[in-house]
């Protein structure tokens, strides 16, 4: 699989006359895998990594992103998007977090998460909820859209492609932002479920610290992917695979199966063809 993906990236970069690749690096497993694949496909001199933290970003993830770029020896730039978001007025939607410990901020956010909606992830997909909840959607989505603009700015200055990091689980469930992290030129891992990305990451010697970190969009403090799904990635991927293959689901939790079906139903309208993806195997 790894060699196929390396060949895919190399072939598509050449086919579409790109000179190299730009990857947004978050400190998570998906961007670590994609950055590694790009380096192996193109060489480190043709890969540029962009790290774009903001006020709510995890300091640990920021350090992991920097450490991983330095480990691979790629050119990278760290740029805070906090000033841009502040200028737009994004942070006025929620109280300032100056001088507050992360633990208090996370408890506050978690309380709002559970208070504003009975099921925040489904309401996110529906684009419904009270005004405060909708403000929350605007609050986190714009962060990805600002990052997309900066990724393309850096890519086009160099004649590079923006290489995305969305996996199949995220794509099928709608765990991405339209015109944000899904707006890219090439998607090399969109055919891989999250659990398969973890397996590939182990094969590619991604640091254990990144592998053990709870997957999170790192847009809202304290909110993880599995918290949004209300199940583990292992359970989610297993159910998704069975649904795609029309396999027997009798040994799965019926409530979780129904939840996944509802997520797929609601997320369908968000899915659209990405220009260049690796064919599913």
UniProtKB/Swiss-Prot annotation:
Keyword Ligase tagged: yes
Annotated residues for binding of ATP: 24-31, 165, 194, 216
EC number(s) stated in the UniProt entry for this protein: 6.3.1.5
Signal peptide: none
One Gene Ontology CC term in the entry: cytoplasm
Pfam families documented for this protein: NAD_synthase
First-tier enzyme category under EC: ligase
GO MF annotation, one: glutaminase activity
Residues engaged in binding Mg(2+): 30, 170
Pathways involved: Cofactor biosynthesis; NAD(+) biosynthesis; NAD(+) from deamido-NAD(+) (ammonia route): step 1/1
Keyword entries, A-Z: ATP-binding, Ligase, Magnesium, Metal-binding, NAD, Nucleotide-binding
UniProt xrefs under PANTHER family: GLUTAMINE-DEPENDENT NAD(+) SYNTHETASE, NH 3 /GLUTAMINE-DEPENDENT NAD + SYNTHETASE
Membership in a protein family: Belongs to the NAD synthetase family.
Xref: NCBIfam families: nadE
Quaternary structure (record): Homodimer.
UniProt name for this protein: NH(3)-dependent NAD(+) synthetase
Gene: nadE1
